[in-house]
């Protein structure tokens, strides 16, 4: 049985007196800061609106949307019976439990409200947010690996399999967090970084966002074949996981966005 020793990385990055700073929190911070800076750089490369100042002002909205939506999404999608019995636990974000799909819904809501107040096109504004999103996904999945959570399915014959300390079975498993970091983070970021600079893509509002939806959805569906499903849910309809079921509408919505964008002439 093959396995790589899990790197003994303390989930706590450092402590400042009574304040404990975890790698997971730093991953969120890195994702927001670097994603924000990337949006500013993209916005400054093209005159007009949405402008860099618009993305500057949106940062707080994005943070609230991701955290609030991510937590509500986890409660609704992944552990609703538990939280119905323990409603106050839903407020205890520090106990863990965030959903990407919930965070996405939260950000979409924030974009719609922000753009309505500013008189901006949600599609054009969302395109640059979509181009930056893989940065946060990359760091978030690395933090999942450091925490030894959301690990993969048993893989006794895979030479790079890892035995995770939090696994009750203590068997070699796919490091699915790293697979997701690579697909949803690195690969998707590079793809979007190339496309968002192409006039035929950048000039069609909604095109970049649509490609992000398709790219993330497909990446997540693939990665879920290697990831252990949540214990309280297991496998659902036709052997699919919750992550896969939530990603299918993402892909379909992305295809629709791209189709609609292709019908519009590029604003070059």
Curated annotation (Swiss-Prot):
PROSITE patterns: LGT
Pathway: Protein modification; lipoprotein biosynthesis (diacylglyceryl transfer)
Domain of life: Bacteria
InterPro entries per UniProt: Lgt
Membrane topology annotation: Multi-pass membrane protein
Coiled coil: none
Enzyme class, broadest EC rank: transferase
Keywords carried by this UniProt record: Cell inner membrane, Cell membrane, Membrane, Transferase, Transmembrane, Transmembrane helix
Membrane-crossing residue ranges in chain numbering: 23-43, 58-78, 96-116, 119-139, 181-201, 206-226, 238-258
Cell compartments where the protein resides: Cell inner membrane
Pfam family, one: LGT
Alphabetical GO biological process terms: lipoprotein biosynthetic process
CC terms in the record's Gene Ontology section: plasma membrane
Main location, first listed in the record: membrane
HAMAP family for the chain: Lgt
Functional note: Catalyzes the transfer of the diacylglyceryl group from phosphatidylglycerol to the sulfhydryl group of the N-terminal cysteine of a prolipoprotein, the first step in the formation of mature lipoproteins.
Name used for this protein in its record: Phosphatidylglycerol--prolipoprotein diacylglyceryl transferase
Protein's organism: Azospirillum brasilense
